[in-house]
Amino acid sequence: MNFPIAAESSLPQRKAEHLQLCLEAGVESPEVTTGLERYRFQHCALPNLSLQALDLGTQFLGRSLGAPLLISSMTGGTETAQRINCRLAIAAQKYRLAMGVGSQRVMLRQPETTPTFDVRDLAPDILLLANLGAVQLNYGVTPAEAQQLVDRLGADALILHLNPLQECIQAEGDTDFRGLLGRIGELCAALSVPVIVKEVGNGLSAMVAAQLLSAGVAALDVAGAGGTSWSRVEGQRAVDPLLRRLGDRFGDWGIPTAESLQQVRQVSATVPLIASGGIRHGLDAAKAIALGADLVGLARPFLVAADQSEEVLDQWITELLAELRIVRFCTDSGDWAALRRPGVLRPC
């Protein structure tokens, strides 16, 4: 798939291309995996539990959730994105899941796109996360504008995404990251809501996690390697043959999700931590929780289901929750903390 983009492709057009590629093209990391397949749960043949009585609920950033699941930030800015976001928001409200929207920078440049992000009326009770590329703080976006995005969405927190590799491959990429940590710290101090920092599929290292926490970031999302590769997404968008080759070459770049999760958890035992990146079902989500995650983010599975229909999305979430419930039951884990007991999750 090839898009005839120019160096200054419009943001809505770029978002439409991203969405189409993630739905239709082969943009997964070709060889690297999440690393979660290297772990197996110890089966308990005599659980002292009732399957139906298990409570999947949890707390994150002071909010109650029906399950430790995040509909990860994906899209906005187009009519198709609006349809998908609305379906996701309705599902998030029904199942009490957290939800993030796609990058809102387009709202600053083209306010007419704002309705494509507006989901609060459909989901008044959910943990809703605004979203902005962190590097945009180096390109003129001010703390006041970030606060404006939060307020317009009615968000409970702001996600800043770090995507240096994607920016390298993107024809329109913003690649001046100098001094960005300081600007993130300034934003954390100025904003009225907590700041979450995430990668976009290449993982956070222990060193970067420590730097971000020292800057005042409230929570982290490792977004490790093993799922959608934004290097491949941008490579497939590109017309320039060099960018297309670079996109493929770096398709497996990054820290696998399981490794990134453990690195970050070693930095802080208490930081609210989200695991995402290549998690495609409840069994892997449960493994991520056992390895130290408080919340698990999934993007592409929600996107594919929501693009089909509300019914398909509903069926998929029901299956996801059933998988989490069965893991808890068959490991004799009465709560999520029990899933982290020594010996419950073992290396294969």
Swiss-Prot record:
Query: Which GO BP terms, alphabetically?
Result: isoprenoid biosynthetic process
Subcellular location per the Swiss-Prot or TrEMBL entry: Cytoplasm
- Report which superkingdom the organism of origin falls in: Bacteria
rRNA-binding: present as a keyword of the record?
no
EC code:
5.3.3.2
UniProt xrefs under InterPro entries: Aldolase_TIM, FMN-dep_DH, IPdP_isomerase
Tell me which residues bind FMN: 72-75, 103, 131, 198, 228, 278-280, 299-300
Among the entry's GO cellular component annotations, what is one?
cytoplasm
Positions binding Mg(2+) in this chain are 167
| UniProt GO MF annotations | FMN binding; isopentenyl-diphosphate delta-isomerase activity; magnesium ion binding; NADPH binding; oxidoreductase activity
Q: Which cofactor does it need?
A: FMN; NADPH; Mg(2+)
Provide the alphabetized UniProt keywords: Cytoplasm, Flavoprotein, FMN, Isomerase, Isoprene biosynthesis, Magnesium, Metal-binding, NADP
Q: How is the subunit organization of this protein annotated in UniProt?
A: Homooctamer. Dimer of tetramers.
Q: What does this protein do?
A: Involved in the biosynthesis of isoprenoids. Catalyzes the 1,3-allylic rearrangement of the homoallylic substrate isopentenyl (IPP) to its allylic isomer, dimethylallyl diphosphate (DMAPP).
Please identify the protein, giving its name as recorded: Isopentenyl-diphosphate delta-isomerase
Q: Which gene encodes it?
A: fni
